[in-house]
């Protein structure tokens, strides 16, 4: 009996049961993993929170029409120039094939949606870029739609609010795309000279020719938290200046800290912030001047 204490225990035997190859019937898209904190949450809960992570506050990218639906009063949006589409002025190989793929992927005809709307009853002309379409690069149609939207705001005496998200100028349109930087900037200047109010909201990412032109020309320049905002890439700058850049370089928080933004606003607070600004700048029908915000 005592000898049993010193004998080696017998190894347990395990049987492997083959899988039948079936998977649990979980609907695709029911869960979303945050790329920032790696937490997994129900997609519906994330959508209820305006696609802002419930755990870390990361702002997930959203499409133009989703953003408009989140922001403006229900039923108030009237789209402008919806059928304006891109040509291929330089005959760039496969360009139109890529445009067609992006149309199918995004449901849009171009990388920006513009139109009339109201926010908490305050009228405005709004433009929202969509990075699913050619990374919202600015070509001739994007520039033209911004120009027309600004002119519409000028004509109707409404503020202009633009949400930017872009990889910069569209290389497939060459010099024509670069011309849009001057074209949009000049439109902003004319509108400003006429007393128009411009609000820009930079979202992730706002880079290249868009950041270097109209995106930075608002009377109010805002950004969503964590947005990448800059002209050239980080590595290019470091190689040029031969210095190591700060960890938070080219983020919305870095720009705010250095006086290049008026505020960094969570998507959850943006509607209230915009409605307040639109209200205090509202022009009274009697005088055409700004109201006292009462």
UniProtKB/Swiss-Prot annotation:
- Record key words, sorted: ATP-binding, Cytoplasm, Fatty acid biosynthesis, Fatty acid metabolism, Lipid biosynthesis, Lipid metabolism, Metal-binding, Nucleotide-binding, Transferase, Zinc, Zinc-finger
Q: Name one GO biological process term.
A: fatty acid biosynthetic process
Which positions in this protein are listed as binding Zn(2+)? Answer: 34, 37, 53, 56
Which PANTHER family does this UniProt record tie to the protein?
A: ACETYL-COENZYME A CARBOXYLASE CARBOXYL TRANSFERASE SUBUNIT BETA, CHLOROPLASTIC
Which Gene Ontology terms of cellular component type are present?
acetyl-CoA carboxylase complex
User: What organism is the protein native to?
Assistant: Listeria welshimeri serovar 6b (strain ATCC 35897 / DSM 20650 / CCUG 15529 / CIP 8149 / NCTC 11857 / SLCC 5334 / V8)
Annotated CoA carboxyltransferase N-terminal domain residues: 30-294
What is an example of a Pfam family matching this protein?
A: Zn_ribbon_ACC
- Cofactor(s) listed in the protein's UniProt record: Zn(2+)
Q: Which residues cross the membrane?
A: none
Please state the residue ranges covered by C4-type zinc fingers. 34-56
The protein in question is named: Acetyl-coenzyme A carboxylase carboxyl transferase subunit beta
* Gene Ontology molecular-function annotations: acetyl-CoA carboxylase activity; ATP binding; carboxyl- or carbamoyltransferase activity; zinc ion binding
Task: Summarize subunit and interaction data from the UniProt record for this chain.
Answer: Acetyl-CoA carboxylase is a heterohexamer composed of biotin carboxyl carrier protein (AccB), biotin carboxylase (AccC) and two subunits each of ACCase subunit alpha (AccA) and ACCase subunit beta (AccD).
Q: Which residues form a coiled coil?
A: none
Q: Which reaction does it catalyse?
A: N(6)-carboxybiotinyl-L-lysyl-[protein] + acetyl-CoA = N(6)-biotinyl-L-lysyl-[protein] + malonyl-CoA
Its gene is accD
Cite the annotated pathway.
Lipid metabolism; malonyl-CoA biosynthesis; malonyl-CoA from acetyl-CoA: step 1/1
Cofactor note, please? Answer: Binds 1 zinc ion per subunit.
InterPro entries in the record: AcCoA_carboxyl_beta (IPR034733), Acetyl_CoA_COase_Trfase_b_su (IPR000438), ClpP/crotonase-like_dom_sf (IPR029045), COA_CT_N (IPR011762), Znf-ACC (IPR041010)
Family membership, please give it: Belongs to the AccD/PCCB family.
User: Which NCBIfam families does the UniProt record give?
Assistant: accD
| Subcellular localization(s) per the UniProt record | Cytoplasm
The EC number of this protein is 2.1.3.15
Q: What does this protein do?
A: Component of the acetyl coenzyme A carboxylase (ACC) complex. Biotin carboxylase (BC) catalyzes the carboxylation of biotin on its carrier protein (BCCP) and then the CO(2) group is transferred by the transcarboxylase to acetyl-CoA to form malonyl-CoA.
Question: What EC class does the entry list?
Answer: transferase
